[in-house]
Amino acid sequence: MQLGIVTLFPEMFAAVTDHGISGRAVRLGLMNLELFNPRDYTTDKHRTVDDKPFGGGPGMLMKTEPLIASITAAREAVSQKQTIGEKARVIYLSPQGQTLKQGSIIDLAKREG
């Protein structure tokens, strides 16, 4: 299984890759996890990924450019390592999306590609 994960906090994934069942899967080569930090795809010296909300108000948004670039890089990296003809699937977790539950994960695991 090839996984490309876009995250601002790549260091927190050491717990996933170094321990437990997922760590064993990585060590046995059953799962390959590659991390992509949107800060690596910025163009300013401060590696800025935050943007202000349009129309004012509280909160912060992510800049689209580094987010799109990191998703594209992750998708290309995963696609290169998959079987010919398989296309990398993008799963974007967002507060506006559906709640990710065990049943959804089982359904995703059953899909091809």
Regions found by a protein language model. Name each.
Residues 61-113:
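S-adenosyl-L-methionine/SAH cofactor-binding core of RNA-modifying enzymes
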